[in-house]
Amino acid sequence: MTQRPDDRVDRVRRVFDDWAERGRDEGMAQSHTPFVRPAFESLDLRPDAWYLDIGCGNGYTVRWAAEAAPEGKAVGLDVSERMIERAREMSAGLENVEFHRAAFPVHPLPHDAFDAILSMEVFYYLPDMDAALAEVARLLKPGGRFACMVDFYGENEASHSWPEDVGVEMTLLDSAGWRRVLEEAGLEVIDQRRVLLAAEEASEPWKATEGSLLTLGQMPA
C-alpha cells in the first residue's frame, strides 16, 4: 500500500471523523486508559505545567492534565474536526484547556513552551515522522518530556495487518527503531517499556503478551 502524503492524512482524518460520529471515541478512550495512564504519570506534571496531547481524540488526557496542572495549560491537537468537537463538548467548563484541529506537524502553538507532550497511537500514521518528531523537540522546553505510545510496532505481530484492515498506510518500527528516531530528533530516551494488561483483563491476547510500547524521551536541560 502506497498513499501520497496528503491522501494518507485525509484518510486518517476521515477514519477518525467516522469513529467520532459513531461514538467510538469513548470506547477508544476507555480501552486506551490502562495503557496511557502509566505514560501520563511518567511525565511528572507540576501544578503549573504546560501539557500537549498530539492526537487527543475526545480529550481525555487533556482533562487529566487540566486536573493535574491547574495552574498550567492543557492543549489537545487532532486531525479530526469531529474529535475536536467531542473534546470541546466533554471539556466544557474547564478554563485551562484548549483544542485545535491540526494535521501535525502543522499547528498553531509556540515553540519552547511545553513541559510535557504525550501521543498515543498517532506517530506511525504521519507521512513524515522525522519532521514530526523534530517539531516535538521544538515544542518542548529544555528538560521537557515526550511520552510516545504505539500498539502498531514490530514485536507486536498481531498489529501487522492493521494497515490493510483500516485502509491507511502506517510506518512500522520495532522498539529499537522507536528509540532511534526519538534520539535522532534530539531527545534522550530515558525509558522504554511495554505496558501490559493482566490476561483476564485483556480483550485481545496481544494486550497481555505484547502490550503498548512506551518510549519516553527527554530534551536536554
Briefly describe each language-model feature range.
Residues D151-E169:
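Short, glycine-/aromatic-enriched active-site segment of Class I SAM-dependent methyltransferases
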Residues A116-D128:
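A short SAM/SAH-binding and catalytic strip from SAM-dependent methyltransferases
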Residues D130-P142:
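A short glycine-rich, Lys/Arg-flanked "PGG" loop and its adjoining helix->strand segment in the class I
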Residues W50-I54, N58-V106:
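Class I SAM-dependent methyltransferase SAM/SAH-binding core
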Residues M170-A185:
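Short alpha-helix
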Residues G143-V150:
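Conserved beta-strand signature within the Rossmann-like core of class I S-adenosyl-L-methionine
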Residues M1-D44, Y60-W64, M83-R86, M90, ...:
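Conserved class I S-adenosyl-L-methionine
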Residues P105-A116:
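A short acidic, Gly/Pro-enriched loop at the edge of an enzyme's catalytic core
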